């Protein structure tokens, strides 16, 4: 299989059927595969720690959805709020009219209304769904809210060997603007509970547990460790890596996912949590409890570790692309973000031709790291901060401060396509660009 085929696989070949499914209504009277009801809830993060938010089906995270790769899937979205809402199917290669971005042409779900979406989910792996839109200064909206959940697209072939599967979904609460006009948070959670408040994850010695880690944060990158254990990373953003690695720490930017298997070989009660003590103290952790073990969960700091995408890559050299697009990232006056000197909606669209390979060069001329997300496609990391790479396929990549990251994509899913920084505050202040097919 060629590198172009690898990038094109998992959904591009089924584009015709995906588009047809999206544009045709399901049979009259047919039940949807899933229903998402958007509404206001009171979420108890811990005893005497309740907050108001908007969520799916009265819970945070929303229900874990499962779909079969290549099999049409229908979701009914019911909006019980007074605001128009949008659900984005993050990581799926589906048509723009159902992707869940207003900029691509997906219609909102009107207040107190409902809408059905039918699409063919591809590629397989850990995907997710979340509210998509602008929040501005309203820190209760969009990705600041509880509107997020895990979507597992089950492969048409064997998914691999593990004994148990555990979702780990990260989020923060009670956001506010600090003195630097950045967003900070008072409370943190994993799976909707603060450390010590939720049920522990029950495991047994000898198990191989697959942790599906999703950072559903609006703005923050997190570093996670599981005391006394290591993670064997097998997939990034739901895509298998060519070179699985055992690491003591997972670094996960907003919208990123990491699939990692842990060999349960140290009985006890341990903390899986943020390596930064202030965030653990504010709730970012969950107890991992072996059968028969008792006592308070323990924390042991991991060894120093630097997260590096290229460690999971192969040894091939990236072929020459058919075209290049360089995107220079800068911050302008008024806390606006620019790409090549322009802020959305004035950014120049990236023009591509179908079935050609393009290299996107992100040149970050700021001190902040930026998680860059491309809708409806995935890309291959070819160079990261000066280090060549191959085979690591993602839909969101962190671009470190003052560094360049290069990624290759095959333009094989025609239609308007949004690309943006997945830091909500940056997205709200111009950090977006459209990709269009010529």
Region roles according to the model:
Residues 117-153:
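Hydrophobic or amphipathic alpha-helical targeting/insertion segments
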């Amino acid at each position: 299989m060629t590198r172009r085929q690898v990038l094109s696989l998992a959904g591009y070949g089924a584009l015709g059927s995906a588009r047809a499914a999206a544009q045709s209504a399901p049979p009259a009277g047919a039940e949807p595969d899933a229903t998402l009801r958007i509404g206001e809830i009171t979420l108890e993060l811990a005893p005497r720690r309740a907050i108001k938010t908007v969520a799916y089906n009265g819970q945070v995270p929303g229900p874990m959805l499962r779909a079969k790769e290549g099999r049409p899937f229908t979701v009914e979205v019911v909006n019980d709020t007074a605001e128009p809402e949008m659900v984005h199917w993050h990581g799926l290669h589906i048509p723009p009219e159902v992707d869940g971005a207003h900029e691509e042409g997906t219609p909102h779900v009107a207040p107190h209304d409902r809408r059905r979406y039918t699409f063919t989910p591809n590629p397989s792996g850990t995907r997710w769904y979340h509210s998509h839109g602008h929040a501005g200064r309203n820190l209760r909206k969009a990705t600041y809210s509880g509107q997020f959940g895990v979507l597992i697209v089950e492969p048409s072939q064997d998914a691999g060997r593990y004994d148990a599967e555990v979702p780990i979904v990260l989020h923060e609460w009670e956001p506010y603007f600090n003195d630097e006009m950045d967003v900070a948070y008072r409370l943190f959670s994993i799976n909707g509970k603060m450390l010590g408040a939720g049920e522990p994850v029950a495991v047994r010695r000898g198990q191989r547990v697959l942790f599906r880690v999703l950072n559903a944060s609006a703005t923050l990158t997190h570093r996670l460790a599981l005391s006394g254990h290591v993670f064997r990373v097998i997939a990034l953003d739901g895509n298998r890596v060519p070179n699985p690695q055992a690491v003591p720490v997972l670094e996960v930017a907003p919208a990123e996912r990491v699939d990692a298997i842990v060999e349960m070989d140290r009985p006890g009660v341990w903390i899986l949590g943020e390596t930064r003590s202030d965030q653990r103290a504010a709730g970012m952790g969950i107890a991992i409890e072996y059968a028969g073990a008792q006592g308070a969960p323990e924390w042991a700091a991991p060894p120093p570790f630097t997260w590096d995408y290229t460690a999971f890559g192969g040894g091939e050299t990236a072929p020459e692309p058919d075209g290049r697009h360089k995107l220079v990232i800068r911050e302008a006056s008024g806390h606006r973000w620019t790409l090549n000197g322009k802020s959305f909606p004035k950014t120049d669209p990236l023009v591509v031709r179908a079935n050609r390979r393009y290299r996107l060069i992100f040149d970050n001329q700021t001190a902040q790291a930026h998680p860059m997300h491309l809708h409806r496609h995935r890309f291959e990391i070819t160079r990261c901060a000066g280090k060549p790479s191959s085979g690591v396929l993602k839909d969101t990549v962190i671009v470190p401060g003052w560094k360049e990251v290069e990624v290759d994509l095959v333009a094989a899913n025609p239609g308007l396509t949004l690309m943006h920084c997945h830091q909500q505050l940056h997205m709200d202040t111009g950090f977006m660009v459209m990709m269009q097919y010529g």
